[in-house]
Structure formats: C-alpha cells, structure tokens
Amino acid sequence: YPKASDTDIEKINTDMWENLGRVIGEYPHLRCLTSVYCEVENIEILQDIAKNQTPCIFIGMHQANWEVAAMRLREQPGLNVGSVYRAPNNKWSAAILQSLRDYKKGEKYFAKSKQGVREMIGHLKNNGQVGILVDQKYNEGISLATLL
C-alpha cells in the first residue's frame, strides 16, 4: 500500500493481529460455530448438488475464520467436500492446526501442491466437491504485481 499513511498501516496491522487472535481462539469451537453462526442462503442449490452428485468447486473469501464455511458445507447431507489448504511454514503450528480439524467424518484436505491438484481432480472425477479460497497463492507460473 504505497499510498497508505503510517496511521493506516498501523490500523491494518492491529486489525490483522486482532483477527488472527480471534481465529486461533475459535479453532477448538469450530463445530459449534458452524451450526450456530453460519447461515446458508439458497440451500436448495446445495441440495441439488448433493442429490445429483454434481462435482463442483466452491470458491470462498479468505476472511475471518476461513474454516467455518468449509465445515458448514461438509455438514450438508450428500456433499463430499474436500478443502484446499496451505500448511504453515512452522511445523509445530501446522501440527496444531491439523489436530484441531476434525477428520472423524473422513474429511479430505488437499495440499496446495502439484500432488494436491492431482488429488483434487480425482476427487472431482468421483463426483466430489472442492472448496478453495480465492487468494490462495501458488509460487509457480507467471508473477503479477498487485495492490499497486
């Protein structure tokens, strides 16, 4: 943000750390949050996808607790939603996050990698659904300047 003032940058940083703290604090309670605070509009679309076993890609916004929407989709009967993730660089943080996710229902997570893409394609070919966040960065390919 080259045109942002020091005050603006400080506010962005403060808000970012506050949001990250909330996200971390919510992790142990994700299952409760999905059923209480996550409302689905146009649920008939999800019901149709489930009924017809339609492969599709759900695209979400990387805002607040990004796990909630994917978990809510997985609660929809008949859907088989796998999520794309990028493991944190810190291996201990990655292990903690993985332990807080619920794998009891056979939930699928696809690593943001070439192998993960292959797994996603296979999942879609088997009439599954994939959830991805619009800002997930991949370091291969063409580099583009953004936020100029």
Label each PLM-derived region with a short phrase:
Residues V23, R31-L148:
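Soluble catalytic domains of membrane acyltransferases
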